[in-house]
From Swiss-Prot:
Entry annotated with the keyword Membrane: no
Enzyme kind, highest EC tier: transferase
GO annotations of cellular component type: cytosol
UniProt protein name: tRNA/tmRNA (uracil-C(5))-methyltransferase
Catalytic activity: uridine(54) in tRNA + S-adenosyl-L-methionine = 5-methyluridine(54) in tRNA + S-adenosyl-L-homocysteine + H(+); uridine(341) in tmRNA + S-adenosyl-L-methionine = 5-methyluridine(341) in tmRNA + S-adenosyl-L-homocysteine + H(+)
Keyword Lipid biosynthesis found: no
InterPro entries: MeTrfase_TrmA_AS (IPR030390), MeTrfase_TrmA_CS (IPR030391), SAM-dependent_MTases_sf (IPR029063), TrmA_MeTrfase (IPR011869), U5_MeTrfase_fam (IPR010280)
Length: 365
């Protein structure tokens, strides 16, 4: 993290640099005009992680600044949401004089929501005992006077939830209110306001869709829930069990009745669709009954494996959200053989960094 680069006065310039870089990187695919979705210039991150520095009686948060090649004290953190900055100050004031809570504490993670919840995870290089639980319970009671907070303690092979290990985010997407369970230590989009823009873009890109939707890498159902309105049915896959559980919870609380979640990898699902193997997890699900003309993918940074790319090429329309332009570019070398880009977007999920979130809609040539 380059803390010196995080100057709101430079926000527009850094976004323009990303625009130019992305347009240049994908020029060979002859995409349409790039749609650019900006972030707030400060207080945009809903989660943050800090290491803890113990110096005598003092205790403070720090991050490692790659530009300086040094640890930098962080009493406040400009990218983090206001609720995280407020909690940082309140929490450190309680931890510093409390031996039971600060002893061998090495990291603090914050997960917050636009709707006002915050989850604090305290990570230790020691096993947590009953004294820790008692002190943490008192800490939660004190902080609850100001925050809607839950606290988790973590150590090697140990996790203590004082109440729950998740928050519920509430987003307004095209005037529709959506609720999302977000679990501690699981992936969620860090920039909630840009996430809303991504959802609205995806809804618009698929608004004239016919038939059903197949989604790979669905996570906690972030896009699944929002896109369900545009399709008769949605079949979605995800491998991580906590994410599958959260996705099912989100389907229920949003009263969505046309989504089926399958817990399996994209690679295994590709084998199932090609009828190379049979899977017990697919018992009772008639894959042939789905009329999927559109496929949606939001893969990890490594991109999509060759077999899954072959599966994806079989669909008329491909909606691809990418957190890594390099692997998207590589995947488009294959997908571009059969499909052309009709929508092209940049979402500034990570201001002041080199990371770029992008989206493309591809239609069969």
């Amino acid at each position: 993290m380059n803390l010196a680069a995080m100057d709101p006065k430079n926000y527009d310039a850094q976004l323009q640099q990303k625009r130019i870089k992305l347009e240049k990187a994908f020029a060979d695919f002859n995409p349409p005009a790039l749609e650019v979705f900006a972030s707030e210039p400060m207080h945009y991150r809903m989660r943050a992680e800090f290491r803890m520095w113990h110096q005598g009686d003092d205790l403070y948060y720090y991050m490692f600044d790659k530009a300086l090649n040094a640890k930098v004290r962080c009493d406040q953190y400009l990218p983090a949401g206001l609720i995280i900055n407020q909690m940082m100050a309140a929490l450190i004031a309680e931890l510093t004089p409390n031996p039971a809570l600060r002893y061998r504490l090495f990291q603090v993670d914050f997960l917050s929501t636009l709707s006002g919840e915050i989850l604090v995870s305290l990570l230790y290089h020691r096993q947590l005992d009953e004294e820790w639980r008692e002190q943490a319970t008192q800490l939660k009671a004190k902080l609850s006077a100001q925050f809607n907070v839950n606290i988790i303690g973590r150590a090697r092979k140990q996790k203590i939830d004082l109440d729950k290990d998740f928050v519920v985010e509430t987003l307004t997407v095209n005037e529709q209110v959506l609720h999302y369970k977000q679990i501690e230590n699981s992936f969620t989009q860090p920039n909630a306001k840009v996430s809303v823009k991504m959802l609205e873009w995806a809804i618009d890109a698929t608004k004239d869709s016919q038939g059903d939707l197949l989604e790979l890498y669905c996570g906690n159902g972030n896009f699944t829930i929002a896109l369900a309105r545009n399709f008769n049915r949605v079949l979605a896959t995800e491998l991580a069990k906590p994410s599958v559980d959260a996705a099912q919870y989100n389907i229920d609380i949003n009263h969505v009745d046309n989504v089926q979640i399958i817990r399996m990898s994209a690679e295994d699902f590709s084998d199932a669709m090609a009828k190379k193997r049979q899977f017990r997890r697919l018992e009772g699900i008639d894959l042939d009954s789905y009329d999927c003309n559109t496929i949606f993918v939001d893969p990890p940074r490594a991109g999509i494996d060759p077999e899954t790319l072959k599966l994806i090429q079989g669909y008329e329309r491909i909606l691809y959200i990418s957190c890594n332009p390099e692997t998207l570019n590589d995947n488009l070398l294959t997908l571009g053989q059969t499909h052309k880009i009709t929508r092209f977007a940049l979402f500034d999920q990570f201001p002041y960094t080199d990371h770029m979130e992008s989206g493309v809609l591809l239609v069969r040539k």
